[in-house]
């Protein structure tokens, strides 16, 4: 007597699959990024190939191209994520939490130490620093007027240039020191100098 075989099909919902997929994607992107910056320590940017990254990261070329069109797209994606993190942090900037926001910026830099150390070593790509300057100018002006209600547009521009370039230089020195100093100590010192000085005029 023949018995019918019962086929049992286990269905997984998209919601169940998504976390695993996201973890795989994050792992793959991390491997690509790590390998990319390892190669940047060995050779110039324009000498790195997708093939080298894939061989060293032990991934297929199709996997790389699933996420990035080429090496330039990879770098732009890394920079864009970095800028997005900075933008989100600056968006939180208010008088009551100013020091905490700046400490958060230092943390973002440390979390992206591979990118930041590369920029310190080889210089940022054209327009990168300027884009940060321009992108945050207007909203920073609105927020800083909470500190200094009587400030004029021209005075704000002087202050912004001084503060922006000063913080960039301090962060650069922090990177060169291999992140030894505590960010909260640096922030407390620099902000007290800036704002105690500015308050003499406003």
Stretch-by-stretch model annotation:
Residues 1-43, 47-202:
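Alpha-helical bundle regulatory/interaction domains
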